Amino acid sequence: MKIVFVNGSPKGNNCISQKIIDRLIPYCKGHQYGILSVNEDMDRNMALQIMNMADGIVIVSPVYAGGIPSVLLGFLSDLEMHMSEKKARVSAIVHGDLFDSDDCLNALSIVEAWTSHTGLAFCNGLGIGGSDQFMVSDAGFDNRHLKEGMADIMRSIIQGVSLASRCVSPGNRMLYRRNMETLHHAKMEENGVEPDTWNVRIARLFRSSSAVKKDTENENVSESDEQKS
């Protein structure tokens, strides 16, 4: 079986989409596979030939504003018009920074609709929320639900079974929300806006305490230097 992984991220190889593809490759044991990175400079004719040869297509893409990147959308539109072979099975993984799954579900529906219009078979979809953590640490890939979802993506392609799409969020919802609030509220304060919630007050208190501690440490260092001199 020939499997093509489509990296739909405009960021190329140094991105979360590629990290996800790297973890799907071990499932291809005994099968041929290739990776197609979608970008403005790609050879569209060559890409079309590759897609026509595929028995299975796995699209991996970030979610931008509730949809998929324009460069990927344009490429899929070209395939819809010019793809001659209609044999491939298609599955998709979309990932977004937001913890909740609404944007991921919308992006998956775009890929599923394209598959139907092109005359291909859509097998399975997986949405991953809060995926920005993967740029900091790979620990999120150890999440049981994420592992099961990725295994289902490859099983649906290889075995030709249709599975219900799902969305997962590898991190902790409360911790993710708290971190995002702290980050965005700090930026708001830098711009002269003062949000007033209990979380903001607590974060402000911790930042003030840290600043006082740092000033005290600097004063102690200065006094020590003066005594030595």
Regions found by a protein language model. Name each.
Residues 127, 132-175:
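Active-site oxyanion/phosphate-handling segment shared across diverse enzymes
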